[in-house]
Amino acid sequence: MEIYLVTGNMNKKEEFLKMMDEELNVEFVNINLEEIQAQDIVEINEHKVKTAYNILKKQDNNKNKKRYVITDDTGLFISKLNNFPGPYIKWMQKALGSKGIADVVSRLDDNTCHAICTYSVYDGKDVHSFKGITNGKIVEPRGNNKFGWDNIFQPESLSKTFGEMTFDEKQNLSPRFKAFVQLKEFLMNEHKKYNNEF
C-alpha cells in the first residue's frame, strides 16, 4: 500500500509530517494540476485527486499496485461577500495580499467568515473526502504569514490570528487539522485491511 500526497508546498508537507503517524509511509509528489472552476471545494478537490491519480498511474510500471493519492484544497468564505472568494482565495491573495483582503473586509459591516479545508483520497475506485471547518473573522494582519491568509484569520471567540499561534495552538482549531483527523483515521483503517490481506 503506497500513499502519495500531492503538494509542492513545503509548509504543507512539514505540517502533514508533524500530524501523520510514523506507521504510515507517505511520499510527497509535486504535480502541477489544473483546477476546475467551481464554487464547491469538495467537487474541485475530487476532480484534482482523480487527475493526480491517473498521472501517477501512467508514470508507474506496476499498474496493479494498491495506491492512495491525496490532494487538499482550502477556501476562505467571507459572509458579507456571499461566501466569496471561497476556493478562489489563492487568486485573491495573489492579487491583493493579506492586507488588501483585510482592507476590503474592513469596509463591510460584518467581518465574519469561515475557512474550509478538504482532503480527498482516491484509490482508483472510490473517492473519499474529509472536510474541516473553522468559523472566524477577518482582521488586520497580525503574526506570520506562513500559510496564505493565516495572519488575517482570527478564529471565533479568540484574540489571536492563526499567524500569531504556535503550531500546537493552531492545530486543534485549524480546518486542515480537523479534516486531517478524519483522513488519518480512514488511512489507518485501510492500512489494517491491507495488512490483513497479506
UniProtKB/Swiss-Prot annotation:
Q: List localization entries.
A: Cytoplasm
CDD domains reported in the protein's UniProt record: HAM1 (cd00515)
Q: What is its main location?
A: cytoplasm
Q: How is the cofactor bound?
A: Binds 1 divalent metal cation per subunit; can use either Mg(2+) or Mn(2+).
Q: Which reaction does it catalyse?
A: ITP + H2O = IMP + diphosphate + H(+); dITP + H2O = dIMP + diphosphate + H(+); XTP + H2O = XMP + diphosphate + H(+)
Q: Which UniProt keywords apply?
A: Cytoplasm, Hydrolase, Magnesium, Manganese, Metal-binding, Nucleotide metabolism, Nucleotide-binding
Positions with a binding annotation for ITP: 7-12, 48, 73-74, 90, 147-150, 170, 175-176
Gene3D superfamilies for the chain = 3.90.950.10
Q: Which GO terms describe its cellular component?
A: cytoplasm
* Record-listed E.C. numbers: 3.6.1.66
Q: Name one GO molecular function term.
A: nucleoside triphosphate diphosphatase activity
Entry's family note: Belongs to the HAM1 NTPase family.
What is said about its interaction partners and assembly?
Homodimer.
Function noted in UniProt = Pyrophosphatase that hydrolyzes non-canonical purine nucleotides such as inosine triphosphate (ITP), deoxyinosine triphosphate (dITP) or xanthosine 5'-triphosphate (XTP) to their respective monophosphate derivatives. The enzyme does not distinguish between the deoxy- and ribose forms. Probably excludes non-canonical purines from RNA and DNA precursor pools, thus preventing their incorporation into RNA and DNA and avoiding chromosomal lesions.
Q: What is this protein called?
A: Inosine triphosphate pyrophosphatase
